[in-house]
Amino acid sequence: MAPKAEKKPAAEKKPVETEKKPKAEKRVPGKDGGADKKKKKAKKSVETYKIYIFKVLKQVHPDIGISSKAMSIMNSFINDIFEKLAGESAKLARYNKKPTITSREIQTAVRLVLPGELAKHAVSEGTKAVTKFTSS
């Protein structure tokens, strides 16, 4: 065991101050909302397609699950396709000197970005979704 620290004799101790300090006032949160406290780091919200991927998976194959790594890959894939379609749609709108991206630009972008049969199915599903949205 380590040796104990020796006690100082009473003569060496500092005299206790007899002056009383004024009591601290109670702080009431004002306009700043109690900014004196430590601020918690705000979490940056991250938008993902994970819940939608899972819903589609359960519609197509109700008995099959998906690993977190596979889900991450699917999320990256959808983000990539979204960026490609958005970029192509923006180019088409610029070429035609239009300030707005409409369903027509999106449809043309789908035909340009996706290959063959996949583009045909995507266009038909997109048209069906737009029709359902406008009718409701």
UniProtKB/Swiss-Prot annotation:
GO terms for molecular function: DNA binding; protein heterodimerization activity; structural constituent of chromatin. PROSITE patterns: HISTONE_H2B (PS00357). Can be acetylated to form H2BK6ac and H2BK33ac. Pfam families: Histone. Core component of nucleosome. Nucleosomes wrap and compact DNA into chromatin, limiting DNA accessibility to the cellular machineries which require DNA as a template. Histones thereby play a central role in transcription regulation, DNA repair, DNA replication and chromosomal stability. DNA accessibility is regulated via a complex set of post-translational modifications of histones, also called histone code, and nucleosome remodeling. The nucleosome is a histone octamer containing two molecules each of H2A, H2B, H3 and H4 assembled in one H3-H4 heterotetramer and two H2A-H2B heterodimers. The octamer wraps approximately 147 bp of DNA. Belongs to the histone H2B family. This is Histone H2B.5. It comes from Triticum aestivum (Wheat).
